[in-house]
């Protein structure tokens, strides 16, 4: 369980409900609340909140006004979970999760709890159900590769070959965004971002494409390889909520779980087998090994 948990960084990188990074969103909500995104508030009965969160409960500002993929992929404190025996859109029929210590989805006595305060929804079938009588599971084929991944790879490759993004770059990114219920890249950045010109440059689109890959392919095992080919994986702090906390005041404290300090440049390429190197002395070993 603990090796497959979303961390706080992933929760932050999903877009706002306007389809841009929450740090860039110039709308009223995120302009006001981004600096205090780790604080908690009472969930208001407005917009689509009733489908995503438990109205009247307390959760972090970070969990409000986010894009549909945030709610589809992540389970979090006071968030709803469609399925698991609940197949109605009515708020009264939706399951919602309590992650604080001594609560049903939090740490009680065993080690079966989330260290970060988040769980994956994507890898769980909505037909799986948990009742007082036991657990009923539904298996399904895990996606090895899917059309959205192909669109994103094509857009990325095309962007890297051009001085400025072409219409095709936007077209294939927008196909993925449309399925997620978001406006196109140029429209979203023009209307909602503090940096409306970002999609117009190669560097800006590179950043956007990489964010789209994270948001669309979250929990599918792609990030491991993406970070390595982009040379973006370096030692960093892994953070989550303070899951030992029993109250909202205690729980919503950003906590460093551990520091990944052993990763170095040589880890971008794994070592070749000795037998492979011995077959051809001119081949040599990968750097650092």
PLM features: what roles do these ranges have?
Residues 1-289:
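Acidic/polar-rich alpha-helix caps and helix-coil junctions
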């Amino acid at each position: 369980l603990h090796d497959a948990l979303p961390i706080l960084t992933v929760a932050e990188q999903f877009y706002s409900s306007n389809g841009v990074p929450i740090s860039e969103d110039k709308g009223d909500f995120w302009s006001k609340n981004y600096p205090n995104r780790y604080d908690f508030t009472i969930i208001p009965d407005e917009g689509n909140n009733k489908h995503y969160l438990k109205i009247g409960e307390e959760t972090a500002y970070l969990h409000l006004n986010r894009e549909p993929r945030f709610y589809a992929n992540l389970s979090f404190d006071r968030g709803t979970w469609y399925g698991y025996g609940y197949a109605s859109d009515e708020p009264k029929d939706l399951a919602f999760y309590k992650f604080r210590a001594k609560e049903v989805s939090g740490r009680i006595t065993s080690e079966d709890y989330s260290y970060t305060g988040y769980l994956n929804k994507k890898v769980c079938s909505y037909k799986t159900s948990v009742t007082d009588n036991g657990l009923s599971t539904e298996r399904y084929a895990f996606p090895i590769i899917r059309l959205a991944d192909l669109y994103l790879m094509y857009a990325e490759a095309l962007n890297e070959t051009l001085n400025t993004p072409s219409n095709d770059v936007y077209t294939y990114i927008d196909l993925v965004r449309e399925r997620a219920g978001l406006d196109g890249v140029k429209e979203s950045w023009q209307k909602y971002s503090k940096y409306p010109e970002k999609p117009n440059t190669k560097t800006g689109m590179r950043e956007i494409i990489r964010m789209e890959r994270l948001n669309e392919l979250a929990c599918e095992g792609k990030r491991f390889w993406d970070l390595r080919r982009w040379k973006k994986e370096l030692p960093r702090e892994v953070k989550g909520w303070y899951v030992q906390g029993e109250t909202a005041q205690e729980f919503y404290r950003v906590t460093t779980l551990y520091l990944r300090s052993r990763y170095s440049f040589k880890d971008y390429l794994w070592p070749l087998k000795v037998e492979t190197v011995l077959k051809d002395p001119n081949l040599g070993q990968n750097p650092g090994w």
